[in-house]
From Swiss-Prot:
GO terms for molecular function: 3-chloro-D-alanine dehydrochlorinase activity; D-cysteine desulfhydrase activity; protein homodimerization activity; pyridoxal phosphate binding. InterPro entries: ACCD_DCysDesulf, D-Cys_desShydrase, D_Cys_desulphydr_bac, TrpB-like_PALP, TrpB-like_PALP_sf. The gene is dcyD. It comes from Escherichia coli (strain K12). NCBIfam families: ACC_deam_rel, PRK03910.1-1, PRK03910.1-3, PRK03910.1-5. This is D-cysteine desulfhydrase.
Amino acid sequence: MPLHNLTRFPRLEFIGAPTPLEYLPRFSDYLGREIFIKRDDVTPMAMGGNKLRKLEFLAADALREGADTLITAGAIQSNHVRQTAAVAAKLGLHCVALLENPIGTTAENYLTNGNRLLLDLFNTQIEMCDALTDPNAQLEELATRVEAQGFRPYVIPVGGSNALGALGYVESALEIAQQCEGAVNISSVVVASGSAGTHAGLAVGLEHLMPESELIGVTVSRSVADQLPKVVNLQQAIAKELELTASAEILLWDDYFAPGYGVPNDEGMEAVKLLARLEGILLDPVYTGKAMAGLIDGISQKRFKDEGPILFIHTGGAPALFAYHPHV
């Protein structure tokens, strides 16, 4: 088993049982293609989401280092920050969140509802900044200030997307391969590609476990030219940690995120409504709605390698629906 080195890394178990991998019969009929969905939106903390897989490794490392504070950064409506704050609460740690308003809105729901509301419930210390122009440097500067106040901070990068956090999605690839074995031969896997850890972790894992399946990242914030090096660098860093080779080509589609990160578009919102009405499953306006718009258009434009079954990775994010109301 090529991924045996995963067990070398300390890991807290927040998720327990594998998340469901489900067939979508009504959605499949609508699109004329077999569509399956990996339900990482139903991980069991703080309204679910993919970041919990990364936090199993990152929080374990924080405890190993003797930290009493988790520090991270993101947008006001960051799913990652919400899940980090929940993990901190569960472990009895302080959480400091450096937040930006990337869409420059004054809409009350965006500023106070959705994920931002949940941060207050988790007793998160909020620090606002004008923009996360250099988040790694800004997080280190914040950590220095927090340390000067007598805390022992552990910095978690935006999205939990470093090599250690991304191991959570190598682990997820193992889970997916086990769920598909003997049941379905997945031709293509579609995932939202943002901070790149989920995409890169899946790329490393699926290359070794399901090499016949193509993995497509639908970008939510950047062009292919800007996103590709982020994913490739993480892919190689993960492979180095696991003492593996990673030579799979990284495939990205950047046609679906305009006008920009965190700004809903018509195609993404149509995808949100479609899955809700056909399957009772909630996507979000920022990540999964746009990724699903890519899947839908990819079928109509014949962009996939063949007409075999497609697996959509549902990374969560439904709390943002409340933040973006009445625009959804």
